[in-house]
Every structure is written in structure tokens, then in C-alpha cells.
Regions:
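ABC ATPase C-loop
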Residues: 151-152
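Helix-to-loop junction immediately C-terminal to a conserved catalytic motif
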Residues: 52
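Conserved beta-strand-loop-alpha-helix hinge in the C-terminal portion
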Residues: 214-237
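The feature captures the beta-strand-to-loop junction immediately N-terminal to the Walker
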Residues: 37-39
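Conserved structural motif at the start of ABC-family nucleotide-binding domains
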Residues: 2, 19-23
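Q-loop/switch helix immediately C-terminal to the Walker
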Residues: 88, 94-111
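Conserved ABC transporter NBD signature motif
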Residues: 60-67, 114
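ABC ATPase NBD coupling module
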Residues: 68-83, 228
Length: 244
């Protein structure tokens, strides 16, 4: 279970102190699919990065499975089963997909069959990818699904993804949503996804709306999603209905 208690993050600027996150508290039960959404600049990505340890909390606590993570490094949080998928995953020229999966798993003896299972689970034909380099020859959607495969190889209990729909085509996006649906159906991990995408939001068990550094609404999808759609109809949507 993920617990966030009174989390705040402030930065100093020429204009003075800026409150990026303001006293955020929430609880996410194990194996839930939760989407954080809201207007741009509202603090969604900063919240995700704070959970992973990529930005330091000014105050508050981050507790994962009963352990206080607040002062732990990114590496230490990863060792506790927290993983983070970036908007633009890194590429590694000269590094094969199978080697990346072995590194992610912490097992340099990871078998070809095990690598293929991870690739298959994210909708990639293993034979076409296992010996390819993770370089610019791969599309954005392919790299994102390979990144998800590495997170699966880590056997992460909490998977955080920051706008995974960014920069991918329609076909890749359909495969990506299938992958998230599959992960959730297996009930092996908690999914926390930052997204404006209606089709991703519609997969969630729960929706958290963040604006101006605060949680403005939180609840089951069946309760919150109709409100989001109503706002869309009213012409004040921050959602996107498709990808390029």
C-alpha cells in the first residue's frame, strides 16, 4: 500500500517561494490502477517524481508497504519495488534488449525464454526484438513497451508512468493500453499513471485530480469519470481524445 501524508514541495525563485505541491495526502491500495489527471502545470509529474525520489519532498511522508521512503534515494526506492517510466524513455546504443532486461532483473543469467516472456507480455514479438539494440531504430511506442518490459522484469510492486501516451502513434497507443490492461488484470502490481488520455483514464479503478499543487477530487472511476466528461462537454477539458 502507498501512503502519502501531508506532502509538500517548494522551490525558491526570483519571485519568491513557489508551492509546487501543497499538503497532499492520499492512500492507494495494493494492485489498484490509479490515474492522476488534471490541467498542465498542476503538479502531477512533480508528485510522481516525488514518490520515486527524483525530487525531494520539502515536508511530509511517503510510505510504501509500511516503510518510510521519504529520505531514501531513487536506487533504494527501486530496491523496495518502486519503478518509474519516463515520458521519453532513454535509448542505449550498443545495448541489446535482452541485455537491458537482464540488467533490469538483476539476474545476469536471465534466460532467452524469460526475456521472451517479458516481451510477449507487452505485446512485442520476442524474436523480432530480443537481439535489437535499444537505439534510434526503434519507434517511441516500441521503446516505451520495452521500458515496461524492464519494469516487469524488476517485478516491481508499484509502477509509475508519466504520460506514457506522449509522442507515440495511434497503433502504438492501442498496444500500450492493451499492455496496461494486461498488467492490471494479473493483479501483481499497483499502477499509478499520469495521463490526460481518456482511454487510459477509463481503464482506472480510481481517479485523482490534481490542480494548483493540490488534490481537488479523488474517487472511484465510475464517480469521477462522468464529471470529467461533463467538463469536456462544457468546453473546459484538459483531456486528449487521441494521439498522432
Amino acid at each position: 500500500m502507498l501512503e502519502i501524508k501531508n506532502l509538500s514541495y517548494r522551490v525558491e525563485s526570483e519571485e519568491g517561494t513557489l508551492d509546487i505541491l501543497r499538503d497532499i495526502s492520499l492512500t492507494i491500495e495494493d494492485n489498484k490502477f490509479v490515474v492522476i489527471t488534471g490541467p498542465n502545470g498542476g503538479g502531477k509529474t512533480t508528485l510522481a517524481k516525488a514518490i520515486m525520489g527524483l525530487v525531494p519532498a520539502t515536508s511530509g511522508q511517503i510510505i510504501w508497504n509500511g516503510k518510510d521512503m521519504t529520505e531514501l534515494s531513487v536506487t533504494e526506492r527501486a530496491q523496495q519495488g518502486i519503478s518509474y517510466g519516463f515520458q521519453q524513455p532513454p535509448r542505449f546504443k550498443g545495448l541489446r534488449v535482452r541485455d537491458l532486461l537482464a540488467l533490469a532483473s538483476g539476474n545476469d543469467k536471465l534466460t532467452v525464454d524469460e526475456c521472451c516472456q517479458y516481451l510477449t507480455r507487452v505485446g512485442l514479438c520476442a524474436g523480432d526484438y530480443i537481439d535489437r539494440e535499444v537505439d534510434t531504430s526503434l519507434s517511441g511506442g516500441e521503446v516505451k513497451r520495452i521500458e515496461i518490459a524492464t519494469i516487469l522484469a524488476r517485478k516491481s510492486g508499484l509502477m509509475i508512468f508519466d504520460e506514457p501516451e506522449a509522442g507515440i502513434d495511434l497503433w502504438s497507443f492501442a498496444k500500450l493500453t492493451d499492455t496496461f490492461r494486461m498488467i492490471h488484470n494479473r493483479r501483481e502490481s499497483t499502477l499509478l499513471i499520469i495521463s490526460h488520455q481518456e482511454r487510459i483514464i477509463n481503464l482506472a479503478d480510481e481517479i485523482i485530480m490534481v490542480a494548483d499543487g493540490k488534490i481537488t477530487r479523488q474517487g472511484p472511476k465510475d464517480e469521477i469519470f462522468p464529471e470529467i466528461l461533463a467538463n469536456t462537454t462544457a468546453g473546459c477539458s484538459y483531456m486528449t481524445e487521441g494521439v498522432s
